[in-house]
């Protein structure tokens, strides 16, 4: 048996959530089938000597082709901006020629962006990995902008590399940004619904989103939509030796809009309340691509907040912290940083948005707080070594049950029907 994955994302290095999921798929298929029968079609990719499976670099759409696709497809409602920017007839031919040469038994397309290249003649062997629902992501951004006047939204995130440089400022200016988000949410919903009905099976990482997508199309036909957990690199686990210091961690790629807004709003809205309650509290912000605006906010709090950039080995940091801060005001999917914390037995304090998709409560190692006073109280609770130890065990238990390698592989066996 052979399998192909078609994507415009290089999974390595695994420095973003989407990359972690794709790398996990490759690890699973490599384990089950062997590297010679796992093929990765990478649109816009380059040859690599160390890639773990068989890599097939494909051309990316030229700027002219991408803009032509936008002009022809977006106004008619045929495709989203992101689909159009990644479409060209040349890439279509390259994908189909490569698939014909391989003759795979299973084809997996990475989100609606690559689903447009699937040949319906082979629908019985095709799956679509939808990641999270883009339509809900953009709607959540708009809702957050309405609820929080201070919110700063950068909707392009990691997709910016596929957008012509001259067009990128439009996505960061408020008036065109809101219009673009509304349009993209509507178009993405159409494409997601189309994928749900078109593919043999559709995969998401969030149970709630999977159920909502299935319900959206229930009156139009049969759709197989399921949630699968991401396979994360097993975190180096050692028994935590927490001693009671009020040290907390925010972890995440700061170029992602929900992370940047989350840590900035935490600093402005919650951190002063925390410092009033715990004057010795300390927040360590770990993650690449901190904007100058966020850096300026962090510097207002002096030594109580440190920006540490990318940290390769998180063992020491997370084993001694009181908890992980996951203060998100918008977002979709499931947050890999929470899984990382659970795997290390680190309790999590999260907004309800950030905890979506996880089991919550003290018995699961995840506390939910949506207001500054609630957050401060939850953080203070975790500075009690005994309570922290109990929640640490609960966090580790949730990881072992749902996100450990054996549990994820068993889920993938069913999702991909290999066992």
Show which residues each predicted segment covers.
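N-terminal subdomain of nucleotide-sugar transferases
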Residues: 1-57, 276
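Conserved catalytic-core segment of nucleotide-activated headgroup transferases in glycan assembly
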Residues: 21, 174-182, 186-189, 194-197, ...
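Conserved nucleotide-sugar donor-binding subdomain of glycosyltransferases
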Residues: 67-116, 162-199
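A charged, aromatic-enriched C-terminal amphipathic alpha-helix characteristic of glycosyltransferases
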Residues: 86, 386-416
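Active-site proximal beta-strand in glycosyltransferases
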Residues: 122-173
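Acidic donor-binding loop of glycosyltransferase active sites
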Residues: 200, 319-333, 346
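Short hydrophobic beta-strand element within catalytic cores of glycosyltransferases
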Residues: 337-340, 347-351
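Conserved acidic donor-binding segment of nucleotide-sugar-dependent glycosyltransferases
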Residues: 365-373, 380-386
């Amino acid at each position: 048996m052979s399998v192909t994955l078609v994507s415009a994302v290089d999974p390595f290095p695994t420095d973003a959530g989407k990359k972690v999921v794709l790398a996990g798929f490759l690890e699973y298929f490599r384990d089950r089938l062997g590297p010679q029968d796992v093929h990765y079609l990478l649109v816009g990719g380059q040859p690599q000597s160390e890639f773990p499976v068989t890599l097939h670099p494909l051309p990316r759409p030229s700027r002219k082709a991408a803009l032509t696709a936008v002009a022809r497809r977006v106004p008619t409602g045929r495709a989203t901006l992101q689909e159009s920017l990644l479409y060209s007839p040349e890439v279509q031919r390259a994908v189909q020629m490569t698939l014909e040469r391989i003759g795979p038994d299973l084809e997996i397309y990475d989100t609606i962006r690559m689903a447009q290249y699937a040949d319906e003649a082979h629908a019985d062997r095709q799956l679509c990995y939808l990641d999270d629902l883009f339509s809900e992501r953009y709607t959540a951004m708009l809702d957050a902008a309405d609820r929080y006047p201070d919110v700063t939204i950068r909707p392009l995130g990691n997709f910016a590399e596929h957008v012509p440089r001259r067009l990128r400022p439009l996505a960061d200016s408020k008036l065109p940004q809101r219009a673009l988000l509304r349009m993209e949410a509507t178009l993405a919903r159409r494409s997601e619904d189309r994928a749900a009905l078109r593919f043999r099976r559709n995969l998401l990482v969030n149970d709630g989103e999977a159920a909502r997508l299935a319900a959206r199309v229930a009156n139009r036909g049969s759709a197989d939509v399921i949630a699968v957990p991401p396979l994360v690199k097993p975190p180096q686990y050692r028994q935590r030796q927490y001693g009671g210091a009020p040290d907390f961690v925010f972890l995440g790629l700061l170029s992602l809009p929900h992370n940047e807004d989350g840590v900035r709003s935490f600093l402005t809205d919650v951190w002063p309340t925390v410092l009033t309650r715990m004057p010795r509290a300390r927040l360590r912000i770990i993650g690449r691509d901190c904007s100058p605006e966020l850096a300026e906010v962090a510097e207002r709090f002096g030594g109580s907040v440190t920006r540490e950039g990318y940290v390769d080995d998180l063992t020491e940091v997370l084993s001694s912290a009181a908890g992980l801060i996951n203060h998100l005001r918008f977002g979709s999917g499931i947050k890999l940083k929470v899984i990382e914390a659970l795997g290390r037995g680190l309790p999590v304090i999260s907004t309800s948005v950030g905890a979506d998709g996880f089991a919550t409560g003290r018995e699961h190692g995840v506390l939910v707080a949506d207001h500054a006073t609630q957050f401060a109280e939850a953080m203070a609770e975790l500075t009690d070594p005994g309570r922290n130890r109990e929640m640490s065990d609960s966090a580790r238990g949730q990881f072992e049950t749902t996100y450990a390698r054996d549990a994820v592989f068993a889920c993938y066996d069913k999702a991909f029907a290999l066992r």
